[in-house]
Amino acid sequence: MIQNEKKHLILYTGDVTKNLKSGIWNASRIKSNLELVKALENVKLTKFTGDGDENLKKNIKVLVPVNEKPQKLDGKQEEYEIIVKLFFLDGENIDIKKREETLSQVFYNLHMLFGIDFVSTLVVSFPHITFLKESGNSSSNEIYDSIDEIPPQEIQSWVDTWKLLEEKVGEGKIGTLGVSEFGVNELQRLISSVNVVPESTQINIGQNCKLPNDLLNFADRHHLKLFFHSDPSALLSESEITSVIHKACPEIPNPARVDWVIRYTILTRHTAVIHQKGYIVQSTYTE
């Protein structure tokens, strides 16, 4: 066996609306990953061995809940509103080629698990960016204090990644695009360089009660929708994912890191009731 060989592991939480106990939903404005962490801690995972699974051919292990095997959506996909938030957690080594592979993995796994081929809205979260700069960010997850601190190559990575998303829009796989934690400066840099502009930005303003006027005016001029959210920039830490993997796969002793996370929310279109909500996480470890 090759020493220090990198391996990938995909974890599927199942429907968190069924698995989570009441009272742990984060309805406040305080950033928290409690929903995801509890979902991973509370679920018993087993290896998925679906027929024709391309992950198996790539030697990627997939773990799914023991008592909730993936099922295709009931009825036609047009009956559902499917919202996906994609968290890129590759801040230490941003690689556009790998992000392209991530997008392929995301759509492949959505199809494999649920038969989903079209996402109504995809919101992307980039590393190192937070709207509220003084919100007490962890030193383990570098956050830039201003747009001037962001290296030009990282800003270019937003644009290059966005162009990959634009291709998915052109292919009919995504309806609309949104961003997370982008303020006016970040939005200006992005919008000036892309063809498909974001239709929304998700921000966290902490305990503040009022949105900045410059953002309100910018959103009005560019027809942007503004949404509040409570997701931390680093959605899942190395220690958190390592603990989950050790529990599910004791044979994997080494630390793991998270490559990307998606949260999917599937709404019944005519009633706006949540049909399913869950997370898919890809991590990397070495053998």
UniProtKB/Swiss-Prot annotation:
Which pathway is recorded for this entry? Answer: Sulfur metabolism; glutathione biosynthesis; glutathione from L-cysteine and L-glutamate: step 1/2
| Record's subcellular location | Cytoplasm
GO BP of this protein? cellular detoxification; cysteine metabolic process; glutathione biosynthetic process
| Cellular component per GO, a single term | cytosol
**GO molecular function, one example?**
glutamate-cysteine ligase catalytic subunit binding
Task: Say if the entry is tagged with keyword Acetylation.
Answer: no
Record key words, sorted: Cytoplasm, Glutathione biosynthesis
Gene3D superfamilies given in the database record: NADP-dependent oxidoreductase domain (3.20.20.100)
Q: Which PANTHER family match?
A: GLUTAMATE CYSTEINE LIGASE REGULATORY SUBUNIT (PTHR13295), GLUTAMATE--CYSTEINE LIGASE REGULATORY SUBUNIT (PTHR13295:SF4)
Q: What family is this protein classified in? A: Belongs to the aldo/keto reductase family. Glutamate--cysteine ligase light chain subfamily.
Assembly and partners are described as:
Heterodimer of a catalytic heavy chain and a regulatory light chain.
> What protein is this chain from?
Putative glutamate--cysteine ligase regulatory subunit
